[in-house]
Amino acid sequence: MNKYSQYVVQNPKYEVGMEGLVKGRQCPTMTYMSNELVPGSNVYVELGWVWDIPDPNRIPEHQHANSDEFVFHLGSDHNNPEDLGGEIEFVVGGETLNINKTSAVYIPKGVIHGPLIWKSYTRPHIQMTMILNAGTLAEAAPAGYKGE
């Protein structure tokens, strides 16, 4: 093993959501970075493929009191990588954002965000969240997870 191989995650954890809980998207999603996977990383990164309008079609309102968050929506068309392959309505701080291109949204700690709702869908895309200063699922609390 070389010096930095301990920082490479090729086998994610599947810990956010239960299989069959949401139709039209990967569930559970894949956790690619956490203190459990890379001790001391102190960041939580999870992602999942969306292959249809999810059902239920709603990520609920929530906030991260101690952590900044980035939410990415990544299109899959290699000929037009900026095209998301769908349209999403995302409420951040009480303002509605309409997203139809590959994008990154910065959400400062403490800002209430959600719901996030798909309005249309044309091709698979990836939804990814990165929560800083949160090294565990319980600290990150993605999608309103409360440890239940």
Where do the language-model regions lie?
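Double-stranded beta-helix
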Residues: 1-12, 18, 118-148
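A short, N-terminal "cap"/entry segment at the start of jelly-roll beta-barrel domains
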Residues: 1-60
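Beta-strand-enriched cores of mature, soluble protein domains
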Residues: 19-41, 68, 75, 116, ...
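Short acidic (Asp/Glu) patches
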Residues: 53-57, 92-93, 109-113
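A short beta-loop-beta micro-motif enriched in histidine and acidic residues
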Residues: 55-70, 78-85
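Extracellular structured ligand-interaction cores
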Residues: 67-71, 85-87, 96, 125-127
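A short beta-strand-loop-beta hairpin characteristic of the jelly-roll/cupin
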Residues: 75-100, 138-142
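Conserved metal-binding segment of the jelly-roll/cupin
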Residues: 96-119
